[in-house]
Every structure is written in C-alpha cells, then in structure tokens.
Amino acid sequence: MEKRTIVKLPGDGIGKAVLDECIKVLDAAGFNAEYVEGDIGWEFWCKEGNPLPQRTIDLIEKHKIGLFGAITSKPKDDAFNELSLELQKKGLVYSSPIVGLRQHFGLDICLRPCRSYTGNPLNFIRRGQNNSIEEPQVDVAIFRQNTEGLYGGVEWSNPPAQVYDALMTHPKFKKNFGSTPVEEISVSTRIFTKNATERIIRAAFDHAVKFDYKSVTVCEKPNVIRETSGMMYKMAQQIQKADYPQIELWNTNIDAQMMWLTKNPEIYGVIVAGNMFGDIVSDGFAGLIGGLGFACSAQTNPDNGIAIFEPTHGSAPKYADYPVSIVNPIAMIESACMMLEYIDEIEIATKIRKAVAEVVTEGKVRTYDMMKMTGKADVINNGAASTQEMAAAIINKFKA
C-alpha cells in the first residue's frame, strides 16, 4: 500500500482530542499514512491575526487531503477584541477559516451522510399503529452547495453608496426600505451561480445512481426566494429530465422538510440544497441518528482533487479543558472513513465502520451523549466512556 501524507488540522477546542483518537483508529486498522500538522483556528487568529495562515494553505495545496477537527468562530466584534492592541491597529477582520478553505480551494461539493446505527439509544423513534414503537432506518445523503449563498460572505453594515444606489433600483427595496437611514441597514447577499448549482445537483444525482437511491429531493424555498431557490429547482428539473429519468425528483420547502423529517425520515434518499438550507437540513437529520457525535462530512473539489473531511460539530470549548475528554469521536472517525473511500481505501473504511457498528450495537461502551447525560466533567464517574475509551473499544474490535 502506498504511504499517504495527510494534513491533520486539529483546530480548536475538542478538535485535537477527536482527531488524535481518530488517527489511532486509522493506524490500528492498517492505514499507512504520514501526518503533517497544519496551523488553523482561534489560536492563530489571536497570535497572528489570521486563523488560516498561508503556510497551512500551502500544505493542503501540496498534499491534497486534510482531516479537520473543529474550529471556534465568534462574532466580528468579539473576535476583534481578543486581538492584541498591535494587531487591532491593523484593522483586521475575522473570517471563518473553514469557510476560507472552502472558498480558496473551491470545495463546493459538501456531502453529509446521515445513517442510523442499529442499537444506538439516540436513534429516532415514533409511535405507529396500535401505539406500537417504530424505529425507522435512516439513510440519507445530503449534498450542500458549499461556497455560495448566504455563507458567501458578501455583506455590509451601512452599505457603501454604490451598493445602496444599486439596491434602490429594485422597486421592493425602494418601497420597503427606501426611507430607512442607510446607517441602519445591514445586507447579506444570497448569490447562486449556474455553474456551481449545476455541479451540486449533478453530484447529488450521480450519488443516487452509484448507491441505488431512488430519489433526489431539492430542499429550498422557491415559493418565497424565487430567484435563487427557483433557479436550483428549475435546473434540477432540467437535469433530471435530460440525464437521470430513472431517479425521482422531489421538491420540498425547507420549513416543511424540517417537519417531514421527524415524521417519515426513511422515505428520503438524496437531498440537495444551497449552503444555508443544506446546513440546516443536515443538522436536522443528524438529530435522528444520534446527534452531532455521529455526523460526518466531506468537502471536495473534483477539479483539483483537494478534499477536507470533518465532523459537522463545533469546537465545544467548554469541554476542551476537562481533565479527561468526554466527547464522542465517532463523527470524526466516520469522516475519516469518508476520506478512506475517497482515496480508494475501501477495505479499511469498511473494517472501521464494522467495528463502530459492533461497539454501538453492543452498548457496553457509550459516551455521555449516548447515555443522555449533560456534558459535565463528572460524567466519566457516572459510567460514561471517555473519548479515548470509545476509540479503544473500536480498536479492540479489530483484534476480535
């Protein structure tokens, strides 16, 4: 097996703990890799005024594949106030380093699969006929456009004259906001491009074909956000009709989708959405399979081969200073499995997933979230497994 070089990006908070344990699992499963660490996150914002240093971008450019832990992100003013006076004088403005990575490398295809593990005590259940308890199997692949939309970062408070003048050419803006003083206005734009929209839609349909899903659902809000959401649904209709007639195309509004996923989640296969709605609906489905401790993701650009794999949870800084790490590493480990599949290490990915499934089903080792505890330092004393113990239990399954 060729030895791979992987850029590890621990980031902030719990990112280091889950990534360290994930790498132990990869090593024990037989993945032959060398890891180089990239600097990213809040520490480097405070030290250097840049949470995504150029040296880290260069590392990823060179090695192509990254495993990412988590980052802390704070509002603009809070971030500015944590800088030294010397850095504050430079007029620096904080921006999320993970968003920066997506935009710099064009990581516009985000896949967030949500699959339930048998025996997970956090799985979604409902009442069926005759008051019976049902636990539907959830297996949904959510494709999120990762670089555009409301997360694109094109926004202003007290917009400059050119922007304000352009907005005033729109009759609805002029009617509803024209009398509002410009200094009282903040604007965040929602920009969709046809090229990026087509790429994410085709990625969703290709995934449905490859893994035998029967439907692709566009989850947007075209009845209100007519231009951007409308463009996505119209383009999906055209693409499905021309190239994927064997796959059903469904359309749901994001608000209705959040209701329906708690009623009949098993009917959905592949879902495709813009940046913000993809973020929302994937967290909704993650709640049905155990929460963010089980939610993984891949962010890829097929054109340049660069890919970043990360759990969808945040850095949870309140847990980072506990004497023993208590967080669930499965989301990070699942993200690594997605990485293995991406680089054609299918056998190792399957081996790890089988071990995770056995540990979850067996139920002997459970982190605090799986035991429905509040995340406090004393959960270990009350029977919850630590991050390290969960990883060790998975590794022990390789030896069985």
Give the residues covered by each predicted segment.
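N-terminal beta-loop-helix "entrance" segment that forms/cooperates
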Residues: 32-57, 259-261
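Active-site rim loops that border cofactor/substrate pockets in soluble metabolic enzymes
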Residues: 39-45, 228-271, 275, 279-280, ...
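Buried hydrophobic positions in well-ordered alpha/beta secondary-structure cores of metabolic enzymes
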Residues: 12-15, 64, 143, 204, ...
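Glycine-rich phosphate/nucleotide-binding loop
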Residues: 92-95, 261-364
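Flexible, glycine/charged-enriched surface loops at secondary-structure junctions
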Residues: 34-37, 211-220, 244-251, 345-353, ...
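N-terminal glycine-rich phosphate/adenylate-binding segment common to multiple enzyme folds
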Residues: 46-173, 276
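Buried hydrophobic packing segments
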Residues: 22, 26, 236, 332-340, ...
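Glycine-rich phosphate/diphosphate-binding loop of Rossmann-like nucleotide-binding domains
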Residues: 5-29, 164-254
